Amino acid sequence: QNGTLTYNGQAQSPSWNAYNPDALTLGGVTSGTNAGTYTATFTPKGQYKWADGTQTAKEVTWTINAATMTVPTQKNSLTYTGSAQSPTWNNYDSEKMTLGGTTSGTNAGSYNATFTPKTNYKWADGSTGAKTVAWSIAKAAGSLSLNKTSIKLTAAKTTDTITVTRAGDGKITATSSAPTVASVSVSGSVVTVTAKAKGSATITVSVAAGTNHTAPSNKTCSVAVTLPTNVLNDNSWATIREVSSAGLGANYWAVGDMKSIILNGAVVGYTFSNLTVNAFILGFNHNSAKEGANKIHFQIGKIGSTAVALCDSQYNNYGSSAGFRMNTSNTNSGGWNDSYMRKTVLGNTNTPTNPLANSLMAALPSDLRAVMQPVTKYTDNTGNSSNSSGNVTATTDYLFLLAEFEVFGTRSGANQYEQNSQAQYDYYKAGNSRVANNHSAVSTAVWWWLRSPYYNGSNYFRFVNTDGSSDYGNASYSAGV
């Protein structure tokens, strides 16, 4: 055979070295299509003979070589979609090779296909066995979202949850930037945040790469913890309100605990200028069945630890001008409800967020006014020497004077039916002094008003005397508040 033949799908015949058709007769298989070995015969003619002296036919083999192929490789990139996918291939010809092995997949990962040459074909290395070729499906991009980006934890709500939504099955983890302020735990796709102490923290939520998704970028949730401290004065009024509304005040503080406030502004002609005074706790959930639950009752106030009453320049003077009087005329008609003290001095005709000008309510700091809650107080609201049960009715007040029974726990000059709807405050029940001093002269005791009208006279209200005893005085006197 002269030269080589390679399979091309067509019939082919070899050319021959030393072949002379005048001397030799060509026979046997002289053409072929498929790759393989064939046998031709050569027989000397007439006077010709082989070099060995014979004239019989000689068999000569000749071949058609298998066509050479390149092993296929994955042509396209595949990314997880949730459905079955198959790759396309470089150098794949179904006429030349058989595709087997794993030819489709759903999950991200690596798979193995096989390619086996068909008849007439071989690999570039000359082999004809099956070749294993790896192909892959890449992970889809991961995603992560949180149902909350901020959380506020309080005494009333010490835990909260964050729901995590992520693609796939990547493990969810969470960390706190300040675990002593807010701790975290993870169960499934829910992150639970638990308050530990007052402060702020950032919760970082992560999702690891899963079976079919890459790890997404982290997400964060800010946490503000306003848990109270046990020192009342260290807490904001907003925090105190949260604790109060949860009915948890007694869990953190005690009757008598103090928080400082600053009074500023004119109150019916008397001006407070940056007066620091302590409001102290009278009781928790005081008389709640009548007055409303989940409230902390305070009294103003103390300077340092000395009990004081607010006194204007008209203190202990009788008159009709503006001042800290129960009424500007000498009467208790209308009782507590209609009194000048309740409506004008304290400002109960308005609300703390819209205070009456020149009232004590308006002089309170705005952060306190923002969280003040009304209480329902029962008092003789008729006056005029009344002493009947029907005259004891309710008012809704933000600022109020104490009633005789609330201070003393007994009745000496108030309407005898007031006490049926009242309770003595725990502060005074504990035996604390009822003596109050002038806020501007803290060594000088003063008498201070109570809201109870005197039952046996039309001109008087009850008050606490300078020695702490119960007494009554003309409604138009200016006294301590």
Segments predicted by a language model, with ranges:
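Collagenous Gly-X-Y triple-helix signature in extracellular proteins
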Residues: 228-481
